[in-house]
Amino acid sequence: MADLEEQLSDEEKVRIAAKFIIHAPPGEFNEVFNDVRLLLNNDNLLREGAAHAFAQYNLDQFTPVKIDGYDEQVLITEHGDLGNGKFLDPKNKISFKFDHLRKEATDPRPHEVENAIESWRNSVETAMKAYVKEHYPNGVCTVYGKTIDGQQTIIACIESHQFQAKNFWNGRWRSEWKFTISPSTTQVAGILKIQVHYYEDGNVQLVSHKDIQDSLTVSNEAQTAKEFIKIVEAAENEYQTAISENYQTMSDTTFKALRRQLPVTRTKIDWNKILSYKIGKEMQNA
């Protein structure tokens, strides 16, 4: 072990530590960070070399954060990244600084948004919040309105989690939906992600995702938002149902198949006649 440590440069150690952090299960960032900190035994090296991993983890996980003075949480995503550690809260039209290690928001300030698309963004946000409230009791959503490659684009992100460390499991749902505002019809693109970690009497992770493509009729803001939510609801319900059905199938078939019903000989042993078997005689003579 000592020889291995001598062979690893600081750069390699940080690279390995960063991978552990980025792949930390939902709700277990602090535990993984503390373990990596002990292994690396160099706080300055960890903070400076793995800072990008802290940020990437929060962006990938859609980490929700509460801003002092505002009621609702906002998600940390690449779509709200303003650079230099600042992020956008599109609903409240503010920017704020975010500490990726402490997961704290500070210094909220007014921030200009794209007025040309704000009415569309607001309509989708209103419909999306109602949907999330109905389907994800602990869920958070953030809706962005941005011009991308000259096209007015709506991006809706959803995050919902259950952290049950006392019961040895944690899980998180994430989904991202996007469409451009164009005459008549447009394409909706979505990606759904589930990640669950169970670690009582074992160590099992479920990591699953699904890409969605659908068409959306574009009319006025309110009606378009309503039709958009119908697509979201149908796709997410179908995905969650499929996950549940697959687990039931695995329970009924796959997991049972892991345990051999019969010995390799394909015949059951008659324990009452064990002495007549060769192995029984060998045991008797032992």
Swiss-Prot record:
GO terms for cellular component: brush border; cortical cytoskeleton; cytosol; F-actin capping protein complex; membrane; Z disc. GO terms for molecular function: actin filament binding. The keyword Cytoplasm applies. Keywords: Actin capping, Actin-binding, Cytoplasm. It holds the Pfam family F-actin_cap_A. The keyword Metal-binding does not apply. It is found in: Cytoplasm, Myofibril, Sarcomere, Z line. It comes from the Eukaryota. GO terms for biological process: actin cytoskeleton organization; barbed-end actin filament capping. InterPro entries: CapZ_alpha, CapZ_alpha/beta, CapZ_alpha/beta_2, CapZ_alpha_1, F-actin_cap_asu_CS. Its main location: cytoplasm. Present in all tissues examined. Coiled coil: none annotated. Belongs to the F-actin-capping protein alpha subunit family. Component of the F-actin capping complex, composed of a heterodimer of an alpha and a beta subunit. Component of the WASH complex. F-actin-capping proteins bind in a Ca(2+)-independent manner to the fast growing ends of actin filaments (barbed end) thereby blocking the exchange of subunits at these ends. Unlike other capping proteins (such as gelsolin and severin), these proteins do not sever actin filaments. CapZ may mediate the attachment of the barbed ends of actin filaments to the Z-line. This is F-actin-capping protein subunit alpha-2. It comes from Gallus gallus (Chicken). The gene is CAPZA2.
